[in-house]
Amino acid sequence: MRGKHRVIVQNNRLHYEFEIKRNITIIRGDSATGKTTLINMLRQAENLGNSSGIEVSCDVPCRILEGSNWKLILEHTENSIFFIDEENVFVHTVEFASCVKDSGNYFVLITRENLYGLPYSVEEIYGIHPAGKYQNTRKIYQQMYQIFSKFQNLVTMT
């Protein structure tokens, strides 16, 4: 799978919209910024379909990768975007890194820790911050922001 993929995940209260550009994207952030909420919304949409009240818009399938069958799921899935929460211990294994490297899928990893076994770009590390105010009748728009910009990557040699 190649190219950019726009992902929109929304219900009547929350709206996430972002673009996946590479095979590995990292989402980081402090507690209560909406990382796990994004995963939960995707899980509900995957498990309950339209009855979940959650709309997922993307040109490729967006799925959750978790549990003990993760390797079996990866072996039988192509051209999808997998979202993985930090609670999954397999993310830190050499076996997972090897599967990601050989996969035709994209991966969005939600974690606060460094993943030394995975070759991801510093330009594909994002955070989430709310762009709207929380009110009972108002939708909250979650925005992604790039943690490291191209200008921060410049190193001066003396």
Language-model segments: which ranges?
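Post-Walker A helix-loop "phosphate-sensing" segment adjacent to the P-loop in P-loop NTPases
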Residues: Q44-E55
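Sensor-1/coupling segment of RecA-like P-loop NTPase cores
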Residues: V100-H129
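N-terminal pre-Walker A segment at the start of P-loop NTPase domains
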Residues: M1-Y16, N136-F151
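Hydrophobic anchor at the beta1->P-loop junction of P-loop NTPases
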Residues: I27
